[in-house]
Amino acid sequence: MVKDPRFYEWRPDSPYRIYADGKWKGERQTPDWRRKALDFAEGSFKRIDAVSGILEQGGEGNMQEALCTLARELFFLHLTVRESSGRAVKALNLLSRYTAPAPVPAAAPEGKEGTLFQGSFRDLPFEPAEGPYFPLHAWLFSAAVFGKHKEKEWQGKAEEEGQRISPRCGSTEAAELYNFLRGTLIVEGSAAIPGVISAVEELERRQDENGFWPGISPWHGYNVLAHSDLASAVRQLDKIEKNIIAMQNRDGSWGI
């Protein structure tokens, strides 16, 4: 779908440009690409070190923003160096400490868990969702892209979360269903994870006549379902594809 080979050229040092140059322009093995990727990754690690101190200090508001930053920098590492180095594993372990759902504030609106994560979701492949599960979904995704999905910790947390969400799909907001799928569909054989099939089929029930999903950005929905070969996912992709193409910018981006 990319219409212009200069995709993201207006952000030459962004992780998206680095990723695009490496994947679509075949520059991943060149010294210049490697230098740019390592330079950006070094900045990510410095930002991770900074937020680790904030997380140690506590404080709900600061922690929420820090967790979003931690997830974002892990995503940027995935776009650039994509290596399970000691520092990347340390960052994953830090995020893992916050995957247990946080207590719901007493002031949460009746019938709502409360939007616990008010931090900036810009540049994150997730949707702001009510409830305490964002760190878990972000960790599932990040750990998977760094090759940890075959380990007992990942499999145990994915299964436990799938068992929680499966019987609740019909009453779970679309953003939370999407975030769960973002953390699991990236893994080969994800259909075997409890809740995955139910969540995909629930999104199909909510998809409107134009292919859009209320509560989920269309490019996020399209991208995550493209990782699945489930019949329901394929039908949803077919339904929205025409409109996804129509929404694309001249340079091939979608509003980034």
Identify the meaning behind each predicted range:
Residues 1-256:
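Preference for long, amphipathic alpha-helical scaffolds in soluble/luminal domains
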